[in-house]
Regions:
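A Zn2+-metalloprotease active-site environment signal
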Residues: 2-6, 19-300
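Internal catalytic-core helix/loop-beta-alpha segment
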Residues: 9
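C-terminal motif of bacterial Sec signal peptides marking the signal peptidase cleavage site
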Residues: 14-18
């Protein structure tokens, strides 16, 4: 019976893989098999992103909000340039970048497929400056570019619905079964499908790619080591949400140091007047700012 089950599951896997597509992760070159299309993933994630943003409270700190959007856009521009220069411009249609800062004391940030990024105010005292924030955002952007959510959904889909899909294939069922299965699986996993639960391999890959993206955008990648050291000191005996599925602190820092020579090849501090913020270390604002202008009276 056990042998029969192994044979059946092997057949299921073969059929599912045959129905999927093989893609290459940018920068790392890792091969991955995806059983779901970009359209299917975006359809599921967009709905859950809208639901989250309807209940979330946007930050009232105008300075920090502007910083998150500025750093995020610099990174998005760097990613777009990289993809275009490497013959991957078709991928750009999958990203409509949005960068949000929300009122939440958790030390966390996440990115949904399609480039919907949320940063919690609680992580800013740890990032301390724009360069470290770029490391965080680069990591989250990397999850989207590497299609980690689609990869995870493919694995969950294969594990939970393999036998059912095999039956559907044998009976000549249409595509609707797959669509219904995806919707059901997405509902079961909820927002966690897009914002947590990545494998250690995926987290390390996001560290690697994020480091490169930050350097491409003009941020010093060397700040990554001190940032992750601060994160490890913060967690103590209770890992922060942001670190719950990540490699150990020692492993992460060792890996980052190993990737540093590669990252530094891409690093060119911004020199133009229009991008002076990307190469500098700017402190995080701890005060709520107002958009109202102050009026001054000149002394006669």
């Amino acid at each position: 019976m056990k042998t029969i089950r192994i044979v059946v599951m092997s057949l299921v896997t073969a059929i599912l893989v045959g129905c999927g597509t093989t893609s290459t992760v940018p920068i790392t070159g890792r091969k991955q098999t995806l059983l779901v299309s970009d359209g299917e993933v975006l359809s599921l994630s967009t709905q859950q992103y809208k639901q989250y943003m309807q209940s979330a409270k946007a930050s009232t700190n105008a300075t920090n909000t502007a910083m998150v959007k500025r750093v995020g856009q610099n990174l998005a521009n760097a990613v777009s340039t990289y993809l275009t220069n490497n013959g991957l411009s078709a991928e750009l249609q999958n990203y409509q970048w949005e960068f949000n800062l929300v009122q939440d004391n958790q030390v966390n940030a996440w990115c949904m497929p399609g480039g919907k990024i949320v940063v919690y105010e609680g992580i800013l005292p740890i990032t301390k400056d724009e360069a470290s924030l770029a490391i965080v955002l680069g990591h989250e952007i990397a999850h989207a570019v590497a299609k980690h959510s689609a990869e995870r959904l493919s694995n969950e889909y294969k594990n939970q619905y393999g036998t059912a899909i095999l039956g559907a294939v044998v009976q000549g069922a249409g595509v609707s079964e797959k669509t219904q299965a995806l919707i059901s699986l997405g509902q079961q996993l909820g927002g966690a499908l897009w914002t947590s639960g990545f494998s250690r391999k995926q987290e390390s890959e996001a560290d690697h790619m994020g480091l490169i993206f930050a350097a491409m955008a003009g941020y010093d990648p060397q700040v990554a080591v001190s940032f992750w050291q601060r994160m490890s000191q913060l967690s103590g005996n209770k890992p922060a949400e942001f670190l719950s599925d990540h490699p150990s602190d020692a492993t992460r820092i060792r890996q980052i140091q190993g990737w540093m020579p590669e990252a530094l090849k891409y690093y060119k501090p911004a020199k133009s007047a229009t991008m002076t913020t990307t190469g500098k270390t700017l402190k995080i604002s701890s005060k709520k700012t107002s958009t109202k202008k102050k009026t001054t009276t000149k002394k006669k």
